[in-house]
Amino acid sequence: MLGPKQSLPCIAPLLTTAEETLSAVSARVRGHIPEWLNGYLLRVGPGKFEFGKDRYNHWFDGMALLHQFRMERGTVTYKSKFLQSDTYKANSAGGRIVISEFGTLALPDPCKSIFERFMSRFEPPTMTDNTNVNFVQYKGDYYMSTETNFMNKVDIEMLERTEKVDWSKFIAVNGATAHPHYDPDGTAYNMGNSYGPRGSCYNIIRVPPKKKEPGETIHGAQVLCSIASTEKMKPSYYHSFGMTKNYIIFVEQPVKMKLWKIITSKIRGKPFADGISWEPQYNTRFHVVDKHTGQLLPGMYYSMPFLTYHQINAFEDQGCIVIDLCCQDDGRSLDLYQLQNLRKAGEGLDQVYELKAKSFPRRFVLPLDVSVDAAEGKNLSPLSYSSASAVKQGDGEIWCSPENLHHEDLEEEGGIEFPQINYGRFNGKKYSFFYGCGFRHLVGDSLIKVDVTNKTLRVWREEGFYPSEPVFVPVPGADEEDSGVILSVVITPNQSESNFLLVLDAKSFTELGRAEVPVQMPYGFHGTFVPI
């Protein structure tokens, strides 16, 4: 661990505007890249943080920069390009921030009169299409996604936007997450909110697996189920959800979106982020929906207040749903990711890090068929391998206490986030391993493999380097869960060192090779591997 007098290294260069690499550059390979590993590693994240004299406030606000590593027969090339969203083009043309983002309110056009600038406060805000969170797939096509109603369809070879898609033109939702789930046949599931006279609802969305016509996007999408928010004007914020073979699991957590503050944010001169608050006086609730019928199950499952961004996996066993989540006990971390905080150095940076809640993996068990005659105060979980409990209360609610899927050694790694599994074979199934980033800094500074059965860790770390979310790619035809490789983009603020694509053997968690590119890259969010 860091000693008491050793400050965290400054990472400001990882959170500054980068240049595009429009022409593919060949990487210098050290070690070896497996010959069978042929495809694209696609990643996205914020890559431009100012226009003219205007500066973004929050890390999440930066313009989407698309990254592509192409692997073919042991060689690797890299290129990148800013997503040509309407927001990016409007800001570029105006030479200023024209469209507001999560943590930055666009100021009125300085060329307008004082009266015009005042009146512009009362005009409805333009929703950003700066989709900088993840690559997602619908009907075989790839889209850039965030949490608004807009997605951008992209040509993954050229990194060019081909179409802008609005969820609200197809179904009655005001957005959708950047973390959909997929059935083996390609059917996609997602979640999005809707707002109406009766308050706010959380909607389960289903998108068909295939196109009926060549030009289709998300045609045929439908709302499978609508779940009323516990508080009409304060729905919960969520970033992902869980899915098993038969059920969708939604976690309604006490991070609240105050709709009135969000609606009036422009008038009040505040960004969207001002309307989000951590309210731990509320407990966390789990909602379970049958994927096949759209029926919301009657079980009322509650737990302590916590924040989760990413679910790890969920599966069914002995009449229960088991769901594993990365959890924080304090939900105020969103505000800490102001760029002025992330770019600090020395004691100031240390103080920001100390305020950040650490994220740890926890397992919850939700018994599905609870008899009205079930005894109060009794643990209803039959799972001998988990210490997670589900206890019926006097009011019929079921109180769920989690099992920690870690030992003290994970605390020394700063917790874990950006969890990934062998999704193609083990999503929605009982599994043994997941992979993530350790956080001894404000961004990931290690890669970790967790064995959820015995809670042991394997760790990869290189001092002064910061790895991205790990992506698991299975060996073709492999039977074992961890037979494959881990891909991660590893970057450094040290200008004399090269950034690189790291390839780890997933089983031993040792390095097979790396592909170095002398290109500046900002720290990003999510990505995916696409075989070719």
Curated annotation (Swiss-Prot):
Effect of loss of the gene: Homozygous knockout mice lacking Bcdo2 develop normally, and both females and males are fertile when raised on standard diet. On a diet supplemented with xanthophylls, knockout mice accumulate derivatives of these xanthophylls in all tested tissues and develop liver steatosis with large lipid droplets in hepatocytes and a significantly increased triacylglyceride content. Accumulated carotenoids impair mitochondrial respiration, induce ROS production and cellular signaling pathways related to oxidative stress.
Enzyme Commission no: 1.13.11.-, 1.13.11.71
Function: Broad specificity mitochondrial dioxygenase that mediates the asymmetric oxidative cleavage of carotenoids. Cleaves carotenes (pure hydrocarbon carotenoids) such as all-trans-beta-carotene and lycopene as well as xanthophylls (oxygenated carotenoids) such as zeaxanthin, lutein and beta-cryptoxanthin at both the 9,10 and the 9',10' carbon-carbon double bond. Through its function in carotenoids metabolism regulates oxidative stress and the production of important signaling molecules.
The reaction(s) this protein catalyses: all-trans-beta-carotene + O2 = beta-ionone + all-trans-10'-apo-beta-carotenal; 5-cis-lycopene + O2 = 5-cis-10'-apo-lycopenal + (3E,5E)-6,10-dimethylundeca-3,5,9-trien-2-one; 13-cis-lycopene + O2 = 13-cis-10'-apo-lycopenal + (3E,5E)-6,10-dimethylundeca-3,5,9-trien-2-one; lutein + O2 = (3R,6R)-hydroxy-alpha-ionone + (3R)-3-hydroxy-10'-apo-beta-carotenal
Family the UniProt entry places it in: Belongs to the carotenoid oxygenase family.
One GO term of the biological process aspect: xanthophyll catabolic process
Tissues/organs with expression: Expressed in small intestine, liver, kidney, testis and less abundantly in spleen, brain, lung, and heart.
Cellular compartments annotated: Mitochondrion
Main location: mitochondrion
Name assigned to this protein: Carotenoid-cleaving dioxygenase, mitochondrial
Transmembrane segments: none
Binding note for cofactor: Binds 1 Fe(2+) ion per subunit.
Induction note: Up-regulated by carotenoids.
Keywords of the record: Dioxygenase, Iron, Lipid metabolism, Metal-binding, Mitochondrion, Oxidoreductase
Pfam families to which the protein is assigned, alphabetical: RPE65
GO function term, MF aspect, one: oxidoreductase activity, acting on single donors with incorporation of molecular oxygen, incorporation of two atoms of oxygen
Record-listed Fe cation binding positions: H179, H239, H310, H526
Keyword Metal-binding among UniProt keywords: yes
Cofactor(s) for this UniProt protein: Fe(2+)
